[in-house]
From Swiss-Prot:
Pfam families: CTP_synth_N (PF06418), GATase (PF00117). GO terms for molecular function: ATP binding; CTP synthase activity; glutaminase activity; identical protein binding; metal ion binding. UTP binds at residues 14, 187-192, 223. The active site is at residues 379, 517, 519. Residues 1-266 are annotated as: Amidoligase domain. GO terms for biological process: 'de novo' CTP biosynthetic process; pyrimidine nucleobase biosynthetic process. L-glutamine binds at residues 352, 380-383, 403, 472. Allosterically activated by GTP, when glutamine is the substrate; GTP has no effect on the reaction when ammonia is the substrate. The allosteric effector GTP functions by stabilizing the protein conformation that binds the tetrahedral intermediate(s) formed during glutamine hydrolysis. Inhibited by the product CTP, via allosteric rather than competitive inhibition. Signal peptide: none annotated. This is CTP synthase.
Length: 553
């Protein structure tokens, strides 16, 4: 089958939801038995998001093969079955880095290196490389049309239509159609100007997806079609919705998938969205509500915990209950402000870096452990649980992680042995030209062997699991025997190098910590066993209406 490409651009303003639109369209096309993959092209100069601030950029989504990517790839995996790889996301920085390496090697034979053709050719090569095993490749171009940063990407996708044939390319432009409340009108002018900007680059959009507070009426759609030179049935209205998982149905109801399949001359069955209809039904019919607290330090931007938040919601669907999420700054708990925790039915500490807010996290773990509140620790959250247990159950008050105190006397958490030479002295703030944080972690999918009588083994229903990782610190084995004698059990270790992967407290209603990131593999259709059981336990916690007596922690 001929490879077909759909390029998705955005106009007027940023943050319109190109990633959600691309993922939703991918879900509908996949439901027509088409093999789909989705790419994200980011116009920033960073090589990848791995060292970017979560408060600026949101979470870093880790793929199976260990690529640190844009959070939109998380949306892609939650909507379609295809797993993303390092090929599905690249940046301006990675393209320039690749071209400059080739120039240094002499690959260009002394040519003057320019944006056109060298940068644009590198972009096109990456897009084609990712398309090998797919029928349709959706490519989301980051940024907004008109931004200087996006120009090389836009030029590259313009050229691709010439290279592979215009009949094999669809350009979708996502644009804002604002509703002016005081006038009671929907305005089409911003969309017209955005398309004009795109035309000046040499790209005529085939489809317009119009984002608005309300459904864009047919008369306004006809007006947009006339001035933007697209068919009326290719002007799609995408209004604000309560749940992003309703969007595949919204697109199908407007026959967007039919238009695309007819354009590409694809003879495929109609989309079967029964799985998505089930998800929507579960959302609408969830009864009651539980409150889960996420204790972190990046709470100013909820997208910093995007996959965790979505995984909790997925687990709520499977338990037929609404999950209300409270993002709590761990620093606010450092003065023992436990009122922030008293109404929670479950406590989750996600991954993170650095020592800011650690005391608040330690107190939160102690509060959950001593008051029988379901606790879920992910990555750093597991390490914090071990430190807290060593300090307050075993009585080793100086127990700590070398991430927070490089000279600590009892390092229950330490750098992974293979990573100690990678980051040099960066953890102590001493940097030189060989120091590097980027790409120095244990990344991607790793196998883990589960202990037979553990809760984790019961939930996964298998002896060996494969989960994704992103860390450079591990549990130090030197105190583990003493820790296990006091009630905290090792429920799983990595097969390759015996790293502690899962911990449990058996005599607690629900207390699990994992070194990996299960949130990256949770989907609305399937959920994830750890999250599903965590929410089940939190639901039981509320049902039993435990009266918490705050202990002196």
């Amino acid at each position: 089958m001929t490879k077909n490409y759909i390029f998705i651009t955005g106009g007027v303003v940023s943050s319109l939801g190109k990633g959600i639109a691309a993922a939703s369209l991918g879900a509908v096309l996949e439901a027509r038995n088409l093999k789909i993959t989705i790419m994200k092209l980011d116009p920033y100069i960073n090589v990848d998001p791995g060292t970017m601030s979560p408060i600026q950029h949101g979470e870093v989504f880790v793929t199976e093969d260990g690529a640190e990517t844009d959070l939109d790839l998380g949306h892609y995996e939650r909507f379609i079955r295809t797993k993303m790889t390092c090929l599905n996301n690249f940046t301006t920085g990675s393209i320039y880095s690749e071209v400059l390496k080739k120039e240094r090697r002499g690959d260009y034979l002394g040519s003057t290196i320019q944006v056109i053709p060298h940068i644009t050719n590198a972009i096109k090569d990456r897009i084609i490389l990712c398309s090998k095993n797919s029928d349709i490749i959706l490519v989301e171009i980051g940024g907004t049309v008109g931004d200087i940063e996006s120009l090389p990407f836009l030029e590259a996708i313009r050229q691709l239509a010439v290279d592979i044939g215009r009949k094999n390319v669809i350009y979708i432009h996502l644009t804002l159609v604002p509703y002016i409340k005081t006038a009671g009108e929907i305005k089409t002018k911003p969309t017209q100007h955005s398309v004009k900007e795109l035309l000046s680059i040499g790209i005529q959009p085939d489809i317009l997806i119009c984002r608005s507070q309300k459904t864009v009426p047919i008369n306004e759609r006809k007006k947009i079609a006339l001035f933007c030179n697209v068919p009326v049935n290719a002007v799609i209205s995408l209004k604000d919705v309560d749940s992003i998982y309703t969007i595949p149905k919204l697109l199908k109801d407007q026959k967007l998938d039919n238009y695309i399949c007819e354009y590409f001359k694809l003879n495929v069955p109609q989309a079967d969205l029964k799985e998505w209809e089930k998800v929507i039904y579960e959302e609408k019919n969830a009864s009651k509500e539980i409150i889960i607290g996420i204790i972190g330090k990046y709470i100013k931007l909820p997208d910093a915990y995007k996959s965790v938040i979505e995984a909790l919601k997925h687990a709520g669907l499977k338990n037929k209950i609404k999950v209300k999420i409270e993002l709590i700054n761990s620093q606010e708990i450092e003065n023992k402000n436990f009122k922030l925790l008293q109404n929670l039915n479950g406590i989750l500490i996600p991954g993170g870096f650095g020592d800011r807010g650690i005391i608040g996290k330690l107190l939160s773990v102690q509060y959950a452990r001593e008051n029988n509140i379901p606790y879920f620790g992910i990555c750093l959250g597991m390490q914090i649980a071990i430190i807290e247990f060593a300090q307050n159950v075993i009585g080793i008050k100086e127990a700590n992680s070398t991430e927070f105190d490089p000279q600590c006397k009892f390092p229950v958490i330490d750098l992974i042995k293979t990573k100690k030479n990678d980051i040099k002295d960066t953890r102590q703030g001493k940097k030189n030209n060989k120091s590097n944080f980027g790409g120095t972690m244990r990344l991607g999918s790793q196998p883990c062997k589960l202990i037979f009588n553990s809760l984790s083994r019961k939930l996964y229903k298998k002896d060996t699991i494969i989960e994704r990782h992103r860390h450079r610190y591990e549990v130090n084995n030197f105190l583990l025997k003493k820790i296990e004698k006091n009630g905290l059990k090792i429920a799983g270790r990595s097969k390759k190098n015996n790293i502690v992967e899962i911990i449990e407290i058996f005599d607690h209603p629900w207390f699990i910590g994992c070194q990996f990131h299960p949130e990256f593999t949770s989907t609305p259709r399937d959920g994830h066993p750890l999250f599903i059981d965590f929410i089940k336990s939190a639901k039981k916690n509320k049902k039993n209406n435990f009266k918490i007596k705050v202990k002196n922690v």
